[in-house]
Amino acid sequence: MYRIRETNDYIQLTYLFYDNGLEIEPGAESEHEVVKCWECVTQKNGALIGGASLEIRAGEYVVADVAVEQKYRGLHIGVELMEKAEEETKRRGGKRAWLVAKVPGFYTKLGWDIVERREAPDISKCFTCERYGKDCHPQIMRKNF
């Protein structure tokens, strides 16, 4: 039904991320070092239905973006994308990875822990955003390997 593969087209993924509620500028390069990206496409026609990116921020591995089109959620695509990012972090010698979660429950099921903001590296602009604490309540999370 679908396949996940590496991609160098971060720009294409930004549109998917934006369309699925991530606060990212569509069509813009990342401000950080993009380590690797993955796309999930349908086998039938190659339509882009999911994606993820792994970046280096403040010297740490960060799962920067993960998104799956609404109608394909529940098929474990997000889980598989997270596994790719975690495997790549470990392959590169990373002892942990970080993320900023809009849906922390998804990540806790995958073994990620919520971390107090003061204990986390500076990996996000969320806490200076005008939406923070109003209609957006992100959590910084970490997974040790």
Predicted regions and their residues:
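Short amphipathic alpha-helix that is part of the acyltransferase structural core
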Residues: 1-27, 41-42, 47, 138-140, ...
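Conserved acetyl-CoA-binding loop-helix of GNAT-fold acetyltransferases
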Residues: 68, 74-87, 98-99
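Conserved active-site alpha-helix within GNAT-family acetyltransferase domains
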Residues: 101-127
